[in-house]
Amino acid sequence: MGISEEIKLEELPQEAKLAHPDAVVLVDRAPGSSAASAGAALTVSMSVSGGAPSGASGASGGTNSPVSDGNSDCEADEYAPKRKQRRYRTTFTSFQLEELEKAFSRTHYPDVFTREELAMKIGLTEARIQVWFQNRRAKWRKQEKVGPQSHPYNPYLPGGAATMQTVVGAALPPNPFTHLGFQLRKPFDAQHAANLAAFRYPHLSAAPMIPSGYFNQFQRAPPHMLPHGMAGMYSPSSSFQSLLANMTAVPRGTPLGKPPALLVGSPDLHSPNHMLASPPTSPASGHASQHQQHPTAHPPPPQAPPQMPVGVQPAQLSPQHLVGIALTQQASSLSPTQTSPVALTLSHSPQRQLPPPSHQAPPPPPRAATPPEDRRTSSIAALRLKAREHELKLELLRQNGHGNDVVS
């Protein structure tokens, strides 16, 4: 079969020979005599079928070279796809990483001399160091784009409370990463960093950022009851209980010192915790509003057991409360910040406070209508009273400094 196929290939036209150049070349190189050897026939048959003969070196690798010679092996190796050698990941030791980070803190783009020196120092190739710096710069750009809050050396983490206080303070450095050697390409605004920290962690930055936090410390208890240094050590609930105890004890011994406790100490009842307190503490705020409104009405409140001793002596408390109301009107007229709430509460409270001086003997009639009204307006009137009392306290502290000197 191989010999007959060889004869047919010789008789093919020129177009067929061009279509099968390998076969033609192999046939031409085959012995020309009719008595072809079996090996030549096998070569021709395999070349026609597309296979690579074992004895033909020109067709190795499937190349279509028209001439097969000794150089065909080199050409086949050049065109053959070369397999890339696999390189495993480089494992850096802690010493190498430390030295690389130090170099990166000095500069993000080290020159070739620096890389070679570092390579000799830590035992790596210069190419590995160059690739590490490329990856490190990419990581740094990503962290810079996301923001400082995701940085591994984050000064805004909740765990670093001491660092948080220094960052939020006035002595904030322009770049919080300067102590680590990191240079930012963009200018870092200190005020922006403080605002960002205050926005993300208000529980850590409320006291240093808000100046009114210092006033909140002195709202815990009246100034004549606690020294200024210990005012911030009392919680709202404990100061409220101590205020009630002092209010029940002070009027019996020194009734003249009682009105300042009402006027100056009452802002303790309107801290934000008491405004948004749970239902057990909301009646206390209602009693506080009643306690501010009934000093001139003088009868003891029927539903407030802690405040019963406050109004036991209506004849003694009425003049001082009138003086306190006059001071309240004077202080509210001096404070321009909250004119509308003060005007509303002043126009609302003197209507109840003016009639009692004419009929101090029968206290029950005006007191009968007050508790329902206090209960109805506890959500709005109490807030207005608290705002007015806060302004009054600030004004009294600004003028006198102590609540004992207000009435005297």
UniProtKB/Swiss-Prot annotation:
Disruption phenotype: Flies display a reduction in size of the arista and scutellum, a reduction or complete absence of the tarsal claws, irregularities of the sternopleural bristles and of the wing vein, and a bending of the wing blade.
Nucleus as UniProt keyword: yes
Gene Ontology biological process terms from the UniProt entry: antennal morphogenesis; chaeta development; elongation of arista core; imaginal disc-derived leg morphogenesis; leg disc development; negative regulation of DNA-templated transcription; regulation of transcription by RNA polymerase II
UniProt-annotated location(s): Nucleus
Biased composition regions of type Polar residues, renumbered to the chain: 331-352
Tissues expressing this chain: Expressed during embryonic development, in distinct epidermal patterns in head, thorax and abdomen and in an endodermal pattern in the anterior intestinal tract.
DNA-binding residues: 85-144
Sequence motif OAR, location on chain: 378-391
Keyword DNA-binding: yes
Keyword annotations: Developmental protein, DNA-binding, Homeobox, Nucleus
Record region (Disordered): 50-82, 258-313, 331-379
Gene Ontology MF terms: DNA-binding transcription factor activity, RNA polymerase II-specific; RNA polymerase II transcription regulatory region sequence-specific DNA binding
Bias type Low complexity, positions: 287-296
Pfam family, one: OAR
Biased composition (Pro residues): 297-308, 353-369
Gene3D superfamilies, alphabetized: Homeodomain-like
GO cellular component terms listed in the entry, alphabetical order: nucleus; protein-containing complex
UniProt-listed PANTHER family: HOMEOBOX PROTEIN ARISTALESS (PTHR24329:SF579)
Free-text function comment from the UniProt entry: Involved in the morphogenesis of proximal and distal pattern elements in a subset of appendages. Also has a role in early imaginal disk development.
Similarity comment: family membership: Belongs to the paired homeobox family.
Protein name as it appears in the record: Homeobox protein aristaless
Organism expressing this protein natively: Drosophila melanogaster (Fruit fly)
